[in-house]
Amino acid sequence: MSYYDPQGVIPYVIEQSPRGERAMDIYSRLLKDRIIFLGTPVDDQVANAIMAQLLHLESEDPEQDINLYINSPGGSVSAGLAIYDTMQFVKPDIVTTALGMAASMGAFLLAAGTKGKRFALPNTRILLHQPAVGGLAGQASDVEIHARELIRTKRRLNEILSEHTGQPYDKIERDTDRDFIMGAEEAIEYGLIDDIVRHH
């Protein structure tokens, strides 16, 4: 299978060919049309699948756009940054489209699409906030190291968001200090997306 599904519920489609019928999982079928679907929280396994698909589609045709559809509550910062770096690394333009919810790292990846090719469906909710940290425990020196790393990561995420949205760094820093929820129209004004898609 080409995609990680934690619930194990992956629809299959039947494809007709001159050699007969063939069953194919929906994510593999979408991949044939250069569509990658991020519909889960972002973790290392999901990130590896998405990075592999991005690299595969680049090797198939480095000139044709790749479409990344996002309906994700976010997740791991390191996994999300790995996807982000791969999106910036590959040659094709990355068309991002949010549907449902693009929260946290989901919103970050939405904004990371190619400028002019970042979209949302009309009722999408987009949420920005600062990276979360679990309960830190251990020696004080270890907690201090992790706290410094969290601050450095937050700064880097805000720099990247500022670069992709055109918003001043200070505004991004203020807005991500708490949950900052936007609709599609507000996301256009903010610079996270470029347009709202109403019809295919």
From Swiss-Prot:
PROSITE patterns: CLP_PROTEASE_HIS, CLP_PROTEASE_SER. The gene is clpP. It is found in: Cytoplasm. GO terms for cellular component: cytoplasm; endopeptidase Clp complex. This is ATP-dependent Clp protease proteolytic subunit. Fourteen ClpP subunits assemble into 2 heptameric rings which stack back to back to give a disk-like structure with a central cavity, resembling the structure of eukaryotic proteasomes. It catalyses: Hydrolysis of proteins to small peptides in the presence of ATP and magnesium. alpha-casein is the usual test substrate. In the absence of ATP, only oligopeptides shorter than five residues are hydrolyzed (such as succinyl-Leu-Tyr-|-NHMec, and Leu-Tyr-Leu-|-Tyr-Trp, in which cleavage of the -Tyr-|-Leu- and -Tyr-|-Trp bonds also occurs). The active site is at 104 (nucleophile), 129. InterPro entries: ClpP, ClpP/crotonase-like_dom_sf, ClpP/TepA, ClpP_His_AS, ClpP_Ser_AS. One of its GO terms (molecular function) is ATPase binding. Cleaves peptides in various proteins in a process that requires ATP hydrolysis. Has a chymotrypsin-like activity. Plays a major role in the degradation of misfolded proteins. One of its GO terms (biological process) is protein quality control for misfolded or incompletely synthesized proteins. It comes from Rubrobacter xylanophilus (strain DSM 9941 / JCM 11954 / NBRC 16129 / PRD-1).
